[in-house]
């Protein structure tokens, strides 16, 4: 559950006809900072009517190796076949705002909702985004 009045950094994420808002919640200076989600019930619904949204969360959290996951952005691989989340984490468990920037691949679940998996420490090498089908420049 997110602390009241501590929701920030909303980002829109669209998967086909599904609309999500992923946002940071909690206290940004603590290791419990995390991401939660709003899902629009129907794409034809009024976006400004709160009854048209389903609130769920947390959808992406820290763990024993990663602290204070928050402020996400989303992109795709150069060839458009993969989805990536860009986010920050705390450097350590102590209160404060020292951050690491992280990037990892995510998928959309069977119901079309984003599934971010487990937040990975910065020491874990991530695969490069897919570039298949794109002309590669040789140096």
Model region roles, listed by residue range:
Residues 4-139:
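Carbohydrate-active catalytic/glycan-binding domains of CAZyme proteins
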